[in-house]
């Protein structure tokens, strides 16, 4: 079920059979979760080889954080996974230059600052939150998006577009099968 739902609907009370769970939200779904899959496709599209890289994954939700960590491990990454309160571990990992990639999906404005990105190659901002005026922000501070020495996904028009593209991909896989889709898109 696409979240968020209206407050009067409890997502736990809605049943989607695994065979049609194209969002990949259920752990037994045959489909990969759309947002983590979209993040992995971003790495593919920029030609960034994750093999052996040190990745800091911020956020441990069932929909994004945990499936993303699993996908990163399958790509032979060394993953440090923290939640939004994992500041000490995050600090030491980032400031000791141990991290090649930062992926933040905590939904907290300014969670990642330019000072956090010392020696980082790529920063993927998955988080979404809104200020008191309703303006959308990511997890990265505004100054991060202006950094020239690393690749940073845009806060608008970045991971969200990839999530929707992967949802469409999963729908096509449901209809035609994964082998046919691989033939079509390569």
What are these regions (language model features)?
Residues 1, 24-27, 32, 50, ...:
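General beta-strand structural signal in soluble alpha/beta enzymes
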Residues 86, 166, 182-186:
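Conserved catalytic alpha/beta core of Sir2/sirtuin-type deacylases, generalized to analogous enzyme cores
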Residues 33-126, 131, 135-136, 140-145:
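Glycine-rich phosphate/diphosphate-binding loop of Rossmann-like nucleotide-binding domains
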Residues 52-59, 178-186:
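Short alpha-helical "patches" and their helix-cap loops
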Residues 8-24, 124-181:
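Rossmann-fold NAD(P)-binding glycine/threonine-rich loop
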